[in-house]
């Protein structure tokens, strides 16, 4: 009888431990799923990158006059590894998603400097691609729309190169940036890649880019 009681207790403890482990795993999966839906800093399925997702990322920043949500879909056949973001003005509390495999999309955001300051959010982000080159993306949301407009750009640089002031100047002034005009624009990036991107004209902007094999 005592042996039966001991066996019963052991089985009960094993079942309870298994149930607890399963519950924790399910909770973790639910949290990961929620995070992958529309959170800046997340990597999501490329096919799910939409305007609605970016609007959710943008809304999470709160009531800020100059802000941007960025989504970049990797259909290049390569893996991207984050290098850095260079801000000409503005900032972000989000770390660039470190690794973006083929078929996935990264979500990122930026905002004007905090406080009553007359700045926009302008910067460049850089990703090292597994072929040894660099994907660079420019976003520019000005403070004063009497003088400036929204602009964006995308380029593949040969070799690995971090984002900096020089890269910003090249992409903004010299390499035919696209105006944020509420329309789609296509570009041959070279190296067997092409891009399709959209930016709106608002001070609370979204930038959606798809990088695919040519």
From Swiss-Prot:
Q: Positions of the site: Important in the initial contact with the lipid membrane?
A: 148
Could you tell me one molecular function GO term of this UniProt entry?
toxin activity
Annotated region N-terminal region: the residues are 46-65
Spell out the residue ranges making up region: Trp-rich region, which is important for the binding to lipid membrane: 140-155
Q: Which Pfam families does the UniProt record give?
A: Anemone_cytotox
Keywords of this entry? Cleavage on pair of basic residues, Cytolysis, Ion transport, Membrane, Nematocyst, Secreted, Signal, Target cell membrane, Target membrane, Toxin, Transmembrane, Transport
One term under GO cellular component: extracellular region
Pro-peptide positions? 20-35
Site positions (Interacts with the lipid membrane): 179, 195
Residues binding phosphocholine are 89, 122, 140, 142, 168, 172-173
* Predominant localisation class: secreted
Q: Give start-end of the signal peptide.
A: 1-19
Motif Cell attachment site, crucial for protein stability: residue span?
179-181
- Keyword Kinase present in the record's keywords: the answer is no
Matches recorded under PANTHER family = BRYOPORIN
Q: What is its quaternary makeup?
A: Octamer or nonamer in membranes. Monomer in the soluble state.
The protein's job, in short, is: Pore-forming protein that forms cations-selective hydrophilic pores of around 1 nm and causes cardiac stimulation and cytolysis. Pore formation is a multi-step process that involves specific recognition of membrane sphingomyelin (but neither cholesterol nor phosphatidylcholine) using aromatic rich region and adjacent phosphocholine (POC) binding site, firm binding to the membrane (mainly driven by hydrophobic interactions) accompanied by the transfer of the N-terminal region to the lipid-water interface and finally pore formation after oligomerization of monomers.
> Per the similarity annotation, which family is this?
Belongs to the actinoporin family. Sea anemone subfamily.
Q: Provide the protein name.
A: Cytolysin tenebrosin-B
Record the organism: Actinia tenebrosa (Australian red waratah sea anemone)
Lineage of origin: Eukaryota, Metazoa, Cnidaria, Anthozoa, Hexacorallia
């Amino acid at each position: 009888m005592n042996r039966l009681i001991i066996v019963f207790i052991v089985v009960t403890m094993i079942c309870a431990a298994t149930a607890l482990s399963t519950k924790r795993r399910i909770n973790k999966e639910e949290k990961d799923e929620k995070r992958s839906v529309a959170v800046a800093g997340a990597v999501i399925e490329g096919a799910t990158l939409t305007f609605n997702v970016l609007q959710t990322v943008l809304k999470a920043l709160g009531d800020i006059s100059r802000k941007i949500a960025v989504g970049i879909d990797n259909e290049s056949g390569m893996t991207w590894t984050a290098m850095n973001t260079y801000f000409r003005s503005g900032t972000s509390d989000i770390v660039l998603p470190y690794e973006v495999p083929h078929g996935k999309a990264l979500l990122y955001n930026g905002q004007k400097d905090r406080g009553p300051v007359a700045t926009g959010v302008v910067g460049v982000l850089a990703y090292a691609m597994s072929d040894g080159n660099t994907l660079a993306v420019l976003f520019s949301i000005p403070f004063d729309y009497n003088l400036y407009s929204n602009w964006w750009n995308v380029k593949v640089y040969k070799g690995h190169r971090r984002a900096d002031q020089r890269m910003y100047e090249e992409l903004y002034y010299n390499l035919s940036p696209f105006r944020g005009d509420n329309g789609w624009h296509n570009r041959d990036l070279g190296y067997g890649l092409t891009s399709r991107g959209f930016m709106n004209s608002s001070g609370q902007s979204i930038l959606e880019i798809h990088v695919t094999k040519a």
